[in-house]
Amino acid sequence: MHLSLTQQCLWPLQILLVSNLLLWENVAAVPTSDSGLGISELLTEDLFDDAVILSQHINGLAIETRRIFLSNNFSSDMFVKFTLQFNRHDEFVVNGLNSCHTSSLKTPKTEKEAKRISLPDFVKMILSILRAWDSPLYHMETELKSMTGAPFSILARVKEIEVKNKILLKRIIKIAKKVKHGIEENEEYPVWSELASLQSTNEESRFFALYKMSYCLFVDTDKVEHYLKHLKCRYFDGYMCQDPENQISLQ
């Protein structure tokens, strides 16, 4: 059969298109990384990576906020006073800092304890910590705005933590679906009940409420960061734990 000039030109192009389609099919059929993870697993890994990075950033902001509280003229006198009282084992300050509103949650203190918790329950614990800070962060920002002399550097960081905490919560809800944890709208979490102290007309009471919040916020953001690293390692059967960036140090 003789081909026209047009057909002769199109024939190589058709062969090329078919070859490319076969090539793409072969690419899709093999693992997409050296670790042997497929596309779905890689997307899940990205989700975990995003959550870990975000939690690290939030923890960093909490550390910065506490540092500014301790060094700024607005609050340093009161914060240094409470720190000295804590170092002297003053009963009021020690008891206050040992009663963060999330302390009712049974959280692991060691990696061995963490491994005894199922993945769904581990995700539930992280969600509870994040949800427990939704109201306190809002009121912390609101009260700081009304306090004379409150520095913008603190306000900006508290606001950023509040916003990023909500974003991280959404990320963890997506992760919860991966580990088969059914999300319930009315799932219980620790309730913060110290608004009266934060709004007190007594300056020392008000500043101690801020001192305690900044301390508890640091403790909990640090926990969330380490718990997410632990969760990531377990979800991917431990191979992630070989990376120094994912070494676990539970608080």
UniProtKB/Swiss-Prot annotation:
Glycan attachment residues as annotated in the record: N73
InterPro entries attached to this UniProt entry: 4_helix_cytokine-like_core (IPR009079), Somatotropin/Prolactin (IPR001400), Somatotropin_CS (IPR018116)
Gene Ontology molecular functions: hormone activity; prolactin receptor binding
Pfam family for this entry, one: Hormone_1
Main location: secreted
This protein's GO CC annotations: extracellular space
Protein name according to UniProt: Prolactin-7B1
